[in-house]
Structures are given as C-alpha cells and as structure tokens.
Amino acid sequence: MTHIRKTHPLFKIINQSFIDLPTPSNISAWWNFGSLLGVCLVIQTLTGLFLAMHYTSDTITAFSSVTHICRDVNYGWLIRYIHANGASMFFMCLYLHVGRGLYYGSYLYLETWNIGVILLLATMATAFMGYVLPWGQMSFWGATVITNLLSAIPYIGTDLVEWIWGGFSVDKATLTRFFAFHFILPFIITALAMTHLLFLHETGSNNPLGLSSDMDKIPFHPYYTIKDILGLLIMIATLVTLVLFSPDLLGDPDNYTPANPLSTPPHIKPEWYFLFAYAILRSIPNKLGGVVALVCSILVLMIMPLLHTAKQRSMMFRPLSQLLFRLLVANLLILTWIGGQPVEHPFIIIGQVASISYFSIILILMPLAGILENHLMKL
C-alpha cells in the first residue's frame, strides 16, 4: 500500500519538499543555512508572539512594558533575549547564506535569487522596526535618523517622512504603526520563504561544483535531515550561550535609557548587522548620494546574474574570483567596523575607501576576473 505521505494532498507537498526531495549528493555544510533560516524564522515568530502579549505600543508605557516583561513575566527575560539575540543569529545565517550563493553561482537561478533578495530587504525592514519598539534612546534616535533619510528624495521627501511618522516628529503614531508592521511582516516573510522554496524546487539545488547533478541525486531524508540537525545544534548552542551568558553583548547600552527627544546620544548607530550599510551611507557627504549608495549596496545583489561573465558557474576552480570574493568579505568586515566608529579621522577616509572598493569589486573586478579566467582556460 502506498504510504499516506505520498497520497494525502497536504502530506504530499511536505513529502516532496522535505522527505523524498531529490538532492545533489555532494552539497556541503554551506547548504545548511536555508533550513537554519527557517528555524530562526519560527523561533522569532513564536518569541515575538509571546512578547506582543505583554508589550504596549504607546510612547509612555512602551519602555516600562519591556521592563515589566523582563522582571514580572514568567521567563519574560528569556523570551526577550532569545528574540533580541535570535535576530543576530538570523542575520548571521542570512549573510552566510547570501555569501554561499555568491561563491557557488546560485544567483543564476533567477527567480529564487530575486525572491531571496526581496526576503533580505523584508527581514532588514522587520529588524529595523523591531529595534524601535523598546523605545530606548537608540530606538528613538535610530528611527529618527533612518526615516529622515527619505527626506532626501526630491520633491516628495518631506511629505513622505511626515506621512511615515504620522506627524511632525517620531511619536506615538510612529511607534504604533511600527509595531503593526513589525507584527505583520514576519508572516509576509514566511509566504516569501515558501515561494523561494517553490522556485528552488523547480530547478533543484545547486552544488559546489556548479555542474548538473541530475545523474547523482539522493533523498533529502535521512541524509540531509541528519546533516542539518548538526548545524541546528551548533546554532542553538551558540544562541543559548549568548542568551544565558552575555545577552547584551550585541546590544547598545543607550537602549537601557528611556527615549528622550531632547537629548541626542553621542554616537547614533544601528545594530551590528546594519553597520556595513550604515558605513556606506555615511561615507558620502551628500544626503541623497548616501541614501542612493545605501539602497544600491543591497540592490546590487539583484544584478549579480548580469555580472556573471565566467564560463564556470561556481568559484571552486576560479582562483582569481576566489581572491576577489575573500577581499569582498574582508571589505564588508572593515565596513562593519567603521559603521560603529565615530565620524572622525581616520575612520572617514577608511570608510570611503572601503565603500568604493565594495562596489568596485562587485561591479568591475569580479566580471573582469571572469573574462580573464575564460581566457586562461584556453591556454
């Protein structure tokens, strides 16, 4: 008798996606991050739901409600810190997942890649709005600075900012709508993630060689379910260690001070996972130019398929491209460091050089390396 998982309309979909899915036999641990991101999304949605039960989105009580969660709610401190540090794990996995895609040429699956970039943008928007909710100093000033960037848009900028604020400054209306969006976006992200998987399963997974693996596929379960559980255990262990030993390691001390519109913090900066983009924004003296560079730093991923000049898909056998990829990673780490530094010499010039090299590596050097490697293959 055919197993129920192959005949039942609902189980059949799950079976084709996670159990009998034909998977390349040679995919490495770098292919683990998709499932880890799924787990992160579930963790964030559940902890967020429990936090929302006790949180109030009002400027007067928001900060107090977060304090109340940590002090009075059963394991509220644990839920809050899992949620806060879970976001860091989410972005760590996201960046490694995107890096894997760049290194192994996964961006040539156009639909999957483009939905992935939209997912990245949606996650960044969600995280930004979530950071505003505790209504600490960095929440308030971060919201003020980042939303104010939209005023650089010609003609409609000022009206657009006031429309987003719901008034003439970041206030109760802003906090309420940010809470509403922060609540709804994860469900949109879940729908996008399903679409991402749908398109991925149309083509099948890429593999480290970048070659077709149709002649050598194995079922996802038990091989990759077991393999993914190892990555999951490592991630959970890291998250639990972070939450229980140093929950505020990645946070900002300024956010333990209630929001005060009359007192600006000495250094306004976002969470660590946005620092690279923040450094690019600050490296351009012109406001509109900075905003354009900020948006392009993420949207440049959309045009990666157009910049692929090599005859080989993966970078596995392309030493020049490998070198440039490693330079790009180092460059992003430098940008992350600069984003957290004050705007003064020598950090300004380092940020400008790193920003120029970021775009140069992606837009100029990598395509040139691909062309050069094509010629080297003929020798």
From Swiss-Prot:
The keyword Heme applies. GO terms for molecular function: metal ion binding; ubiquinol-cytochrome-c reductase activity. Binds 2 heme b groups non-covalently. One of its GO terms (biological process) is mitochondrial electron transport, ubiquinol to cytochrome c. Keywords: Electron transport, Heme, Iron, Membrane, Metal-binding, Mitochondrion, Mitochondrion inner membrane, Respiratory chain, Transmembrane, Transmembrane helix, Transport, Ubiquinone. It comes from the Eukaryota. It is found in: Mitochondrion inner membrane. InterPro entries: Cyt_b/b6_C, Cyt_b/b6_C_sf, Cyt_b/b6_N, Cytb/b6-like_sf, Cytochrome_b, Cytochrome_b_C_euk/bac, Cytochrome_b_N_euk/bac, Di-haem_cyt_TM. The chain crosses the membrane at residues 33-53, 77-98, 113-133, 178-198, 226-246, 288-308, 320-340, 347-367. Component of the ubiquinol-cytochrome c reductase complex (complex III or cytochrome b-c1 complex) that is part of the mitochondrial respiratory chain. The b-c1 complex mediates electron transfer from ubiquinol to cytochrome c. Contributes to the generation of a proton gradient across the mitochondrial membrane that is then used for ATP synthesis. The cytochrome bc1 complex contains 11 subunits: 3 respiratory subunits (MT-CYB, CYC1 and UQCRFS1), 2 core proteins (UQCRC1 and UQCRC2) and 6 low-molecular weight proteins (UQCRH/QCR6, UQCRB/QCR7, UQCRQ/QCR8, UQCR10/QCR9, UQCR11/QCR10 and a cleavage product of UQCRFS1). This cytochrome bc1 complex then forms a dimer. Belongs to the cytochrome b family. This is Cytochrome b. It comes from Tamandua tetradactyla (Southern anteater).
